[in-house]
């Protein structure tokens, strides 16, 4: 939660810190170990406000709440030294390329900063060698055209090579949920079915 005394920056960029009598931790999704401050991992919570389980759904409950009562939210987050949390994306959206975890939100925020980009979805696509590789589905900003090489060079100024998208696609419209969120799994499935042509 945030407080009236929190700075504007904290209110705008974090979700605050834990409420009284609630525990939170950030864990490595693969090992379950708590990660150091400012490291991205899965956001878990435990306390009086955590549900006891899904009604008549024991398997779903077991997947979400562990034996120690920790609710595994499926959110990727980081927590600073003060205990303030920042949401970094969804665990299901995380891309694992050759054993390296890549967080789409990081790439998407960088690409949003480019003047030719109106909207973007970064997705992991299956790859025989690496397991997954990074792909960017880009909708140009109004009146703009996007250039693959320009966007690639722009990202390389900020990112390690393995995080830079291998595949680039230009999008007119995204598949959306009823609430307007991009359905990344649909983009992935469409690519597998051969429905996308790469940007030149």
Feature map (PLM): residue ranges:
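Conserved ATP-binding loop and adjacent catalytic segment of the adenylate-forming AMP-binding
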Residues: 1-23, 36-41, 50-52, 62, ...
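A structural signal for short hydrophobic beta-strand segments in well-ordered beta-sheet cores
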Residues: 24-26, 75-79, 122
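Residue-level signal for well-ordered, solvent-exposed loop/turn and beta-edge residues enriched
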Residues: 25, 32-33, 84, 181
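Conserved ATP-binding/catalytic segment of the ANL
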Residues: 33-38, 42-105, 110-113, 129-130
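Conserved C-terminal "lid"/linker of ANL adenylate-forming enzymes
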Residues: 95, 121-128, 132-139, 148-200
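Short acidic amphipathic segments
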Residues: 114-120
């Amino acid at each position: 939660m945030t407080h009236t005394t929190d700075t504007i920056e904290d209110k705008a960029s974090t979700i605050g810190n834990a409420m009284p009598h609630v525990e939170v931790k950030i864990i490595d999704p693969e090992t379950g170990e708590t990660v150091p401050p400012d490291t991205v991992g899965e956001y878990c919570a435990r306390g009086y406000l955590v549900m006891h389980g899904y009604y008549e759904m024991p398997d779903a409950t077991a997947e979400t709440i562990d034996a120690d009562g920790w609710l595994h939210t499926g959110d990727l987050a980081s927590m600073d030294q003060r205990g303030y949390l920042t949401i970094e994306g969804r665990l299901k959206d995380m891309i694992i390329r050759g054993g390296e975890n890549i967080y789409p939100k990081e790439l998407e925020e960088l690409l949003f900063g480019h003047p030719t980009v109106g909207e973007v979805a970064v997705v992991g696509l299956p790859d025989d060698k690496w397991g997954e590789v990074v792909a960017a589905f880009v909708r140009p900003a109004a009146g703009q055209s996007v250039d693959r090489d320009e966007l690639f060079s722009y990202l390389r100024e900020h990112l390690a090579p393995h995080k830079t998208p291998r595949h680039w696609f230009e999008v007119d419209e995204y598949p959306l949920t009823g609430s307007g969120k991009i359905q990344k799994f649909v983009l992935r499935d469409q690519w597998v079915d051969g429905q996308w042509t790469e940007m030149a």
